[in-house]
Amino acid sequence: MLEVVGLVKRYGDVLALDGCSVNVPSGHLVGLLGPNGAGKTTVMRTLFGLVVPDAGTVRWSGRSVDVRSRQRFGYMPEERGLYPAMRGAEQIAYFGRLGGLSAGDAAAAARRWMQRLGLAGREDSRVDRLSHGNQQRVQLAVALVHDPDLLVLDEPFAGLDPIAVDVLAALLHELCEAGTTVLFSSHQLDLVQDLCEDVAILDHGRVVLAGRLSELRAGALRRRLEVTLGRDAGERWWERWSEALPGVLVAGGDGRSVRLTVDRSVDLEKVLIEARSTAEVVRFDFDPPSLSEIFREAVRS
């Protein structure tokens, strides 16, 4: 397990991390979310000693992270850090050597990951002559070449086409099933919702919400509800609901259906009774809020 405990980091008058704490269970795929400037990249850099916190600790498997443990980490930074004049396979193998592999093992692993990531035939291509998407695949191979126990990816899906997104998502799931722990940041919340079991949301340098996504959605303060009647009930037939049903807000509708957001405290049976008093109800769909809605609520509050 990765444990980030009470990290504090100041840059002059700017408080980048304000007691940030987050746990990443072993073998889990965790999305680290937050608006721009929330502190996501700073957290990731502290894991690798690129940023030294003013306070707080980082532990891996119960021990403070040091140079030796970092050799078992893989990192894909937001600012891609490739050597443009090096050939793809040569570059990946070079980082494999830095990760502790022998020359032969590093070269073999480089070829294997290039094949796996759709870069077969480009082993001898200079990095600066590859497309943006293929450069990103080389950067991912650099992070994976030494088979790390912890994989940290800063905006790995940025700039990828839909097919490449699907390939990377499937790979991350496969890695986690094999026991790799993965922490990644992304602004693509729909993708994170489909991909992750766990999320942590940062704002102003601290974690404002974290946990199992299914539990966060089930326990959210507001939920979505759509009600459809069997006949047209006229314009704005739902207007009285805001008075009769405290905690119910109308998001929109027409003569036959209405979309609502309801507080967690609202008794849904009362909503159904109110709808049936208007006309026959043919649809009564309840959905927990999306990750995007949870994110906005957490950051606003």
What are these regions (language model features)?
Residues 69, 220, 295-298:
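Short, flexible helix/strand-to-coil boundary loops that buttress conserved ligand/catalytic motifs
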